[in-house]
C-alpha cells in the first residue's frame, strides 16, 4: 500500500471588510477556493469585519451553512434602526447579528471552540477604543486575535466586535478591552499574512466599497410631522434645527453626526487599505531589486577574476549578509489578488428603513465572487 501524501499548508487567505456585500462576495470567492487544488494547502485565514465572519465559517469548512444563512438574512436581523430619541445614547442601530448568528448557526462561543481545533488558523482584527492610553507604535489601537492562542469565549467576542460597524452600533467588550469594527485600523490585514513565516502564497479578496450618500429625506419627513405643532417653543426650535441640517446637506456638508461618522470611517478605511497594499507591493519590489543588485554586484566583481576579485566578492557578500534594515528577514510572496466592487448589485444597511435584500441579488454577488477568483485561477493554471 502506498503512503498517504501529507500536503504542506503554506497558503494564507486574506479577507477585507465589506458589510453584507463583502460577506456574499467572499462566500463565492471561498467556495471557488475550496474547490481548487489550493484549498488543502490553506493554513491561515486573516479577516476583518465581514471577513472575520466569512473567514471563520471557511476555517470551519461550513461554507454551505454560511450560504444558507446569508440567503435568509435581512437588514433588520443584522442592524435594526433605533427610535430617533435613542440615537444620542445608543447609536443609530441595535446590533442584532449576534442573536441571529446564535439562532441559525449556533452559539458563537461554541463555534470558536471548534475553531480552536480546526486545521486552519483564523485571525481577526478589531479596533481598540478602550478608555486608556496606547503607545504610538505600528499596531496602536489594533487588536489581533488568533484562534490558536485566544480563549474561545474571547475569540467569539472578537469576531462579533470586528463585524460591528461603528457608524451604526456601540462598541463591544472583548476580554478586558472595548472594541469595534476592525476596519478603522486594518480593513485588509495583508501585513499579518506576510509576517507568518510559513506562508509561500497569499490568496486575497479586497472589497472596493461604494459609499452611498446619506441624504436628508428622513429629516424632511420628521420636520413635516413636527410642523403640525409650530406653536410649541421646543418643537419650533427643533424644526429650525432640522431646516439647518437640510441646508447643510444641500451644500454637500454633513447634515448630522451619523453622516459625519460615515465620512470619517470612509476616509480611515480607504486610507489604511490602500496603504496596506502599497506597503506590501513596495516591499516585494524592494526585495526583488535588492536580490538582483546582490547578484549583479557579485557577477561584476567575479568577472575581474583572480584572487583579488574573489576576496572582494567575499567581502561584499559578508557586507550584504550583515546589513540591517526593517524588512531584512522578509521575502517576496506571490499573491493571487481579487479586487472588486459589488457591480450593479449592491445591498447595504441604510440608516433608516432599509430595502429588503432579495435572494436574486444575493446569489448574483456570490456568483461574482466565485467567477472573479475562477478567472484568476485559470490565468495561473490552478485547477
List PLM regions with ranges.
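Catalytic nucleophile serine of serine hydrolases
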Residues: 49
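Patatin-like phospholipase
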Residues: 1-46, 56-383
